[in-house]
Amino acid sequence: MSSPITLFTGQWADLPLVKLAELAKGWGYDGLEIACWGDHFDPDKALSDDKYCQTRHDILGKFGLKVFAISTHLVGQAVCDVIDERHKRILPPNVWGDGDGPEGPRTLLAFR
């Protein structure tokens, strides 16, 4: 029994999922470990839209790929350091806030 060969999509979050899926198939991968940033996978949308997950499966299926994991670890990297402007690139907009700069997530995360 062989293990599937998968690609983690986080390093390519600047590419649309459909483009990355096409490339991954061409590179010989069996499936993807999908990042929850870029347009690859939105957990909130998955909870609110009954058809959203199927659209992700359909994109991968078009290229004969499967989902093997979903990654949410990027936002967790913001918890150890003092939050500053560098974190804006890794925090989702609802955590970063509405233009409050680093003070927005500091305040929000302090009460969670």
Predicted regions and their residues:
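N-terminal pre-domain/capping segments
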Residues: M1-R112
